[in-house]
Amino acid sequence: MLESVSPPHLFAVMLSRVHAVCEALAAEGALPAGIDLARIVVEPPKDASHGDMATNAAMVLAKEAKAKPRDLAEKIAEKLRADDLVAAVEVAGPGFINLTLQPKVWSEALRTVLADGAGYGRSAVGAGEKVNVEYVSANPTGPMHVGHCRGAVFGDALASLLDFAGYDVTREYYINDAGAQVDVLARSALLRTREALGEEIGEIPEGLYPGDYLKPVGEALAAEYGDKLLAMDEAEWLPIARAKSIAMMMQMIRGDLAALNITHEEFFSERSLIAGDTDRVAATIDFLRGKGDVYEGRLPPPKGAPIEDYEDREQTLFRATAYGDDVDRPLLKSDGSYTYFASDIAYHKTKFDRGFRNMIDVWGSDHGGYIKRVQAAIKAVTGGQGALDVKIVQLVKLLRNGEPVKMSKRSGDFVTLREVVDEVGSDAVRFMMLFRKNDAVLDFDLAKVIEQSKDNAVFYVQYGHARGHSVFRNAREVVPDLPEETVARAAFLADAAVERLTDTAELGLLRQLALYPRIVEAAALAHEPHRIAFYLYELASEFHALWTRGRDLPHLRFIINNDAEITKARLALVQGAVSVLASGLAVLGVHAPDEMR
């Protein structure tokens, strides 16, 4: 959680004033005493010509007040007209209230941006609440591929956003190292060990992992054990090959993630759930059985689509239907081993036991059908105190100039994350993976994400930041004392006559800057980091539009040679823009360059 936050942002201030008006009306008898104000919002109007802000207060209170929405809106509007921040109030449509704010509001908003610096937009909305964000959690069977990339970026950006909004965030990776796939990995590594010892292995047999990335594992095993490994029984060599393979795969995965500036505080091993003397899966099943949530029974035959793990036999079942799932779920396979779901229940219980009431899992699109059962399990093991939000990330279609990209030779059958990052850079990957809502399929074109055009969002936003710094460099002829260092420059510009910023384009940029804290809070509460990316593109658009306007109309240029006062005011506006661009890019894990090369 962050140590300091901005003061209440402008939209929060106006919301509190709308609340105060409604409370005053209640005191006068125009509204019921104690009326619920929680559904009132103050937000930007859909059409900018309707004003600076709009509120639904009359619309959501009218029914309880037994009044017509428009009549109630007129009463609220009458009181809002007396507010010192409000220049005009208009009742529109069935009862919406549009507000136009006084010009001084925007000047003060810019001064707040300059004063808060990198802290502008930070929020206390999280109130220090602990939240566990689990993302990536790829099987430790090979390098990260482009399909993992989107979930990795999304989870990392979401964790940063929540931290910025005042939550106490833990970033976690669940290592799936207890399933059959790691035994296949071990057998694949043994084959590569034989190869490293000089044996001709020919074509990789079907069912084993074919990628060349396993050659170093075989070489490491050969160097450590020589041909002793080949003389062992499977029961002896399998754990050795498995442990070495998992360790080296996780080292590779961490390196792949580091190339995207992605880190985790916790790496939780699935195998640790059943390691040693404590079987936490069995303990969790016993715990649920004691609550009456586990029983021995037979599932009815599935109707329509087959139910995963369905077996027509008496078996151990979790009573998932009692917690909102469609069917009860098996916990043990016919051979007595745990289902993956059973391990998943135990794993999520450890999160709760570690103090996390708020859990977020980032899953691939093929796991959508798994959500209900895990949410049901969390309700059961936490007594309803734990909450899980599952964010599904859809597929990424990798293209080059509109054509599908061929597979990787190194990996065997997929394009690796590292190949993509090496080609276009981590900034392009991160920003463009976030420039579309997570549950929509993403076309990622390797050629287009490095274009220098408005159509390339990451370039357009970064160029806005770099263009702002070019203004500072050029301004020193008119304002020779302008500091180079960011904090010192903001302090120097704090006394600028920003009330002189009255042009339409200048006011548009000021309004956009004032919107940032609200965007941060809304994005954090919705668990949607793409909102930050969208906002940054709009902010960059406003800044570029202002720059273009100054090019076409010389009196609106940032630097006016014979007017140091307006130059300093516009430099303050540029400082506000680059500060917020840098802040938003930092939340997304993208660099904010001072120059574009």
Swiss-Prot record:
Signal peptide: none
Any GO BP annotation: arginyl-tRNA aminoacylation
Record keywords: Aminoacyl-tRNA synthetase, ATP-binding, Cytoplasm, Ligase, Nucleotide-binding, Protein biosynthesis
Membrane-spanning segments: none
Subcellular location: Cytoplasm
Domain of life: Bacteria
EC code(s) of this entry: 6.1.1.19
Record's catalysed reaction(s): tRNA(Arg) + L-arginine + ATP = L-arginyl-tRNA(Arg) + AMP + diphosphate
SUPFAM superfamilies assigned to the protein according to its UniProt record, in alphabetical order: Anticodon-binding domain of a subclass of class I aminoacyl-tRNA synthetases (SSF47323), Arginyl-tRNA synthetase (ArgRS), N-terminal 'additional' domain (SSF55190), Nucleotidylyl transferase (SSF52374)
Claim: Nucleotide-binding is one of the keywords in the record: yes
Pfam annotation, one family: DALR_1
InterPro entries, A to Z: aa-tRNA-synth_I_CS, Arg-tRNA-ligase, Arg-tRNA-synth_N, Arg-tRNA-synth_N_sf, ArgRS_core, DALR_anticod-bd, Rossmann-like_a/b/a_fold, tRNAsynth_Ia_anticodon-bd
CC annotations in GO: cytoplasm
Keyword Transferase applies: no
GO-annotated molecular function: arginine-tRNA ligase activity; ATP binding
Placement of sequence motif 'HIGH' region: 138-148
Self-association state and partner proteins as the record states: Monomer.
Recorded family membership: Belongs to the class-I aminoacyl-tRNA synthetase family.
Protein name: Arginine--tRNA ligase
